[in-house]
């Protein structure tokens, strides 16, 4: 393994671009290869068997690109168990941080909201992680099945999105929630709208920074952290290249990016 090798980042669609943004900011010397499986998004409503099969294809594709690390920029995939991938490949695998300590620090009365996909909410793992850190915490998990299709469909100014945000945040308002975590990497695309809906007294948190910090720790431990040169971004998707380029423009310095349409069955 060589420190000049790229870092792989994967997601079910465009959501992971929000994590790639943070990774690029915190690791400016690294090269990244991002894979968004836009042909089969969203993963949050898929069966576990389907999801594991899709992830296996992406991991195999990235392995052939000689990546030195893989960051799973998707909470649904992280919930399936990053541990099952560790040790089975010649690189470190980093999943999304649950952000428990970050949430508790931002919530004086320990009233916490979780916005996520149906799969992630059903797993119960975010709630368990928060309660393990503080058994007195009150956790309000809300599944948001409408968000990903609206974000992937670029419906950022639509009444449908405004209605969905109001619907999903209503339980938080009733409960007096003080901090909310965006436990799906798509949701930072609409973070400002969610913040506006909840008001200035509620902190809306994105776990991308904590995830990026985990990636840095793993690279340092393996002696693979680059400290010189300008990093490059390669953004790959399995469908809808033009749409991915537009959405990437909301998160990334597109002049530093190469975009390509890929077939995961070919390397």
Q: PLM ranges: what are they?
A:
Residues 1-267:
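Non-catalytic structural scaffold of enzyme domains
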